[in-house]
């Protein structure tokens, strides 16, 4: 009988800890919206960059040999390498 009672108390505390962990994680997401929807923010960034890219924004020049350079089939606008566009 004592073992059953101890097990019930243990399960109760485990449930309380789980509940507190779930509530705390939801609260963290609400406080930091940047962490709540990183995928949506990434999609917006890709859309923003792709709207600037294309034949008009890409003069077809490829930046030089430095490590951060755009390489074919990517070109950089004005050869500044601020962002790379796919031809």
Swiss-Prot record:
Cellular compartments annotated: Secreted
Species in which this protein is naturally found: Xibalbanus tulumensis (Blind cave remipede)
Annotated domain remarks: The presence of a 'disulfide through disulfide knot' structurally defines this protein as a knottin.
Domain of life: Eukaryota
Modification(s) after translation: Contains 5 disulfide bonds.
Propeptide residues per the UniProt entry: 26-45
This protein's record includes keyword Nuclease: no
Protein name, as recorded: Xibalbin-2
Signal peptide boundaries: 1-25
Keywords for the protein's UniProt record, in alphabetical order: Disulfide bond, Ion channel impairing toxin, Knottin, Neurotoxin, Potassium channel impairing toxin, Secreted, Signal, Toxin, Voltage-gated potassium channel impairing toxin, Voltage-gated sodium channel impairing toxin
Family as reported in the entry's similarity comment: Belongs to the xibalbin-2 family.
Tissues expressing the protein: Expressed by the venom gland. Not found in the whole body.
């Amino acid at each position: 009988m004592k073992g059953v009672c101890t097990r019930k108390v243990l399960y109760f505390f485990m449930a309380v800890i789980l509940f507190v962990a779930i509530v705390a994680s939801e609260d963290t997401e609400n406080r930091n919206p940047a962490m709540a929807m990183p995928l949506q923010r990434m999609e917006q960034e890709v859309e923003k960059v792709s709207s600037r890219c294309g034949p008009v924004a890409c003069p077809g020049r490829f930046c030089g040999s430095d490590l951060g350079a755009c390489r074919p089939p990517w070109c950089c606008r004005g050869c500044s390498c601020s962002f790379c566009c796919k031809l």
